[in-house]
Amino acid sequence: MVLEIVLITGMSGSGKSVALHALEDAGYYCVDNLPPQLLPAFVALEHHHHGNRVAIAMDVRSATSLHQVPQELHRLRSQGVAVQSIFLDATIDTLVRRFSETRRRHPLSHDDPQQERKALVQIIDLERELLADLREASHVIDTSQIRASQLQSYVKSLMPGAQGQLTLVFQSFAFKRGIPMDADYVFDVRMLANPYYEPALRELTGLDEPVADFLQLQPDVDLMRAHIEQFLAHWLELLDRNHRSYVTVAIGCTGGQHRSVYLVERLAQSFGNRWTALKRHRELDGRQ
């Protein structure tokens, strides 16, 4: 059987432990804070002792060796290992708030607590710089506006793509709450007719049939969908040929409730026949 390796990295406070626990629940043998220089020996050992599914978490405490990881992942892939690298991220405001709420110290913090509070933003900026190469080589998940249970479910949903097939993630969002940090492509659909201004549709979402019926009658909506599909169809083929594992396509409208949700549903349906297509509705998920 093909050996599956899932690497979990990312910013301190972004949810790496939550993601690792999700993989443990899914049947992966998990290890936390593995030094990067031990990765080759560990992979060889665990393949013989713990089966075919291994998840590894690394953080910035191994910063001096992390630059080796992308090259090592490439080597493992060339040997037929199915490797996924997931990088968890969040906005700086979110990370600062999480450290404040948990009262935990940042791994790169100074010994002086007073200095730590003053420098937390600078420490996070330094961490982001140290992890930049690893982030570039990974599938990025923005955890700023999702709960732990939602992150666990999302990480588990990514696992079927471990065999190297391109996985598309279509995500709806509200511009007023910020563009998702993990988006590879962002499409603005705020110029389309808004069901919010129809009293009978205001409290519904793009998942509801009356909203879908309304939007299907708008020529510009269908034209927007067709143009997005045409753009993606061309470039996804190239990304697939270059062995890209994940592409996140974010569709944004004003409230993330009607237009973007509807288009995400239609795009996922359209591209699901060719690739693995996942759906996320950021603002709707936050209601649950």
UniProtKB/Swiss-Prot annotation:
InterPro entries: P-loop_NTPase (IPR027417), RapZ-like (IPR005337), RapZ-like_N (IPR053930), RapZ_C (IPR053931). GTP binds at D59, V60, R61, S62. Belongs to the RapZ-like family. It comes from Verminephrobacter eiseniae (strain EF01-2). Displays ATPase and GTPase activities. GO terms for molecular function: ATP binding; GTP binding. Keywords: ATP-binding, GTP-binding, Nucleotide-binding. This is Nucleotide-binding protein Veis_1053. Disulfide bonds: none annotated. NCBIfam families: PRK05416.1. ATP binds at G10, M11, S12, G13, S14, G15, K16, S17.
